[in-house]
Amino acid sequence: MAVWFSTSAVVPALTREWGLSPSGQAWMTMAVQLGFVIGALGSAVLNLADRIPSPRFFSISAFLAAFLTALIPLLSDGPGTAIPLRFLTGLSLAGVYPVGMKIMATWTRENRGWGIGLLVGALTVGSAVPHLANFLGGFKDWRLVLYSAAGLAAAGGLLALLFVREGPYATSAPKFDWGYALRAWRNKEITLANFGYFGHMWELYAVWTWAPVFLAASFDLTGIPGRWSGLAAFAVIGA
């Protein structure tokens, strides 16, 4: 998940180099969210996570996200190419986050909540890693941050390919049927649970995008070296 907020961590540098407008800055992150939503819906409709072995699907998606992220410092000279690459990165991450949840669920049953919570915590720290990379040296060159994030994503994909397998509680899913969605809407308990879940992290992702920019501006005003804002952002998001 390090690639998700990789460009968000270097937006100030990209703004200086590419002359990003405020909307361009926002789209560097929003494109990922949009790609993820479309990818997750498409994956669900096509039953990709059940038709392709989950560890393999996870690995392919992680490798693709890493490749697309690395293309930005290699090829991009502005938002015209970077934003589509970010959208495709989000599309790829739809095979990482939800599929990782599925794999974890196959290894847990009574303690499934603990297992999913552990995975979400790991994903959260991973999302914050680009800011740590910024602190450790990426502040001098934004490309190092993106290469670091891409490298971590590729390493995660390789580990999943070599060592991760579905657990003993794996079940085969039925064929996708639009009728299930209609029946779910008729079930009051499920409908209320769904409404509680829809958009459940919109405010958190907004803060994760805004906080590093706020910290960088605050540190700049107080004369604190800018690289320290990366460490502060890592602590805020990772905690």
Predicted regions and their residues:
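Extracytoplasmic
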Residues: M1-P22, A40-S43, V207-L215
